[in-house]
């Protein structure tokens, strides 16, 4: 059987079905939501996770286009196939806008729908025009109206850290969405998608009966590709990639899992893969970083700086209650809600007794992409050279040549210009953590707690554990002596692996040259 073409970049369900492109069947979720209690629904998922395709699937379903669903789950589930009037608003292109631009964007979105419904003399205000659209569609068809709003929060993402501008744009959006509550009797179904969760009072005014399905277990796999969908529905794709990479099926699946899997939006939850990355990987026949290449997380970097969130804070994992990460981003007191809702961390476990979730970076692609995005903020113009150094270090560490790897690092630091705002130990610890975190073949832990204190950096390979202490303005010998005096290595005595202690130091010479040094001993 010939392999179907992947719909990379395509978000229109009707086009995908008409052109017979590859499609993962999510129609059971569409039927479930359309036949549950409630009128208003909201779903938060990271970008490039299939939200737009889900909305256009719903559009075709509510328009009664039964022929598009031949062979899909919903074909057997739905008996009536009633056609409803659908108003579909796409806010995904409403980014990087001032208030006047946003108002013109609303005008364009409304005008498109007004032309469809024959409204020739619309009112001026956006909310009045939306009311008129709903009333006209209801009157012309005699049926309740379906409203689908894609990426409702797109205009706000870039200004989430600018209070004054955020409030201005938020007020305009509140005005636009205000008719949704008052027109309830005329509405069959309202569905909004987005990346972040803004508080209901801030945008949706009196719309206090919206059902947020983002963390509901029945909808855990509504977007993305679950492991079952991959293994049972894409075996030929995995085999083709395995042949290209000269790997076994099992090895290829493990690589896909390591790079693109790891998402969970509730607990328990199936393993969910990033669909854009997975399909792009199959199309290009190459495992690479695709998600970060499709968009720069500028707003995230800005927010990390605003909240003084350090790279090391990501660590191995973090524990939090639901309200700490599934929270409105405009009122957040930590960056955790933005990290979670944007897809940079995800749920890994849940403890019923404490009601605490364990959160962590989902996979290798996100880890590497995130740390590479952070690197320029610590090393300015030397990022490219640092990436080259890291790649060479990784090879040497695999060969258990730690001293040669650190010699490369020493040579690199000699090229880094000194700045006054880097004259403290924390700067070098965070930079070193990013560098070691990008050594993705190894397990890296920063500031690991032991009974005697905290180890600055721990690096674990297949056969060796490196216990590292970092000092600024002191000697590498002093750093090594702290490892000895506080018995940091004792924590790994039962690991069965070789343990190497590494003391590292940074000093600034009179000519402002950065001097990196180290000493190491084996146990």
Pin down the residues of each PLM region.
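Phosphate-binding site recognition
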Residues: 1-424, 439-440
């Amino acid at each position: 059987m010939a392999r179907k073409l992947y719909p990379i970049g395509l978000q229109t369900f009707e086009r995908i079905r008409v052109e017979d492109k590859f499609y993962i069947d999510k129609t059971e979720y569409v039927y479930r939501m359309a036949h549950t209690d409630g009128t208003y629904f909201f779903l938060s998922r990271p970008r490039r996770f299939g939200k737009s395709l889900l909305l256009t699937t719903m559009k075709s379903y509510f328009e009664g286009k039964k022929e598009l669903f031949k062979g899909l789950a919903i074909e057997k589930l739905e008996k009536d196939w009633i056609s409803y009037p659908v108003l579909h608003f796409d806010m995904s292109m409403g980014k990087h806008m001032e208030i006047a631009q946003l108002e013109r964007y609303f005008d364009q979105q409304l005008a498109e729908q007004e032309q469809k419904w024959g409204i020739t003399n619309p009112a001026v205000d956006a909310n009045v025009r939306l009311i008129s659209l709903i009333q006209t569609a209801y009157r012309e068809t005699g049926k309740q109206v379906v409203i689908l709003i894609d990426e409702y929060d797109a205009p706000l993402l870039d200004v989430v850290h600018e209070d004054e501008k955020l409030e201005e744009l938020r007020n305009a959006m509140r005005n636009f969405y205000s008719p949704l509550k008052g027109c309830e009797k005329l509405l069959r179904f309202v569905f909004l998608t987005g990346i972040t969760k803004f508080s209901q009072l801030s945008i949706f005014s009196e719309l206090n009966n919206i059902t947020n399905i983002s963390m509901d277990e029945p909808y855990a796999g509504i977007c993305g590709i679950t492991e079952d969908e991959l293994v049972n529905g894409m075996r030929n794709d995995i085999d083709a990639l395995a042949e290209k990479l000269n790997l076994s099926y099992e090895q290829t699946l493990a690589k896909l899992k390591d790079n693109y899997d790891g998402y969970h939006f509730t607990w328990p939850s199936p393993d969910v893969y990033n669909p854009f990355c997975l399909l792009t990987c199959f199309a290009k026949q190459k495992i690479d970083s695709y998600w970060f290449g499709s968009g720069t997380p500028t707003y995230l970097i800005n927010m990390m700086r605003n909240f003084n969130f350090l790279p090391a804070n990501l660590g191995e994992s973090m524990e939090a209650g639901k309200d700490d990460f599934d929270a409105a981003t405009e009122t957040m007191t930590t960056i955790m809600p933005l990290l979670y809702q944007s897809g940079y961390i995800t749920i890994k476990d849940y403890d019923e007794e404490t009601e605490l979730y364990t959160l962590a970076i989902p996979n290798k692609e996100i880890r590497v992409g995130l740390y590479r995005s952070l690197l320029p903020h610590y090393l300015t113009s030397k990022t490219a050279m640092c990436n080259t150094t890291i790649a060479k270090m990784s090879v040497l560490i695999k060969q258990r040549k730690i001293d040669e790897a650190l010699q490369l690092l020493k040579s690199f630091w000699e090229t880094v210009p000194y700045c006054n705002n880097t004259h403290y130990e924390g700067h070098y610890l965070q930079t070193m953590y990013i560098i070691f975190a990008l050594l993705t073949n190894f397990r890296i832990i920063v500031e690991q707690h032991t009974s005697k204190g905290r180890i600055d950096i721990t690096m674990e390979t297949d056969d060796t554990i490196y216990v590292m202490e970092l000092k600024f303005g002191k000697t590498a010998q002093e750093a090594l002596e702290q490892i000895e005096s506080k018995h940091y290595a004792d924590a790994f005595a039962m690991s069965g692996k070789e343990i190497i202690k590494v003391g590292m130091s940074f000093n600034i010479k009179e000519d402002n040259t950065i001097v990196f040094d180290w000493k190491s001993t084996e146990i």
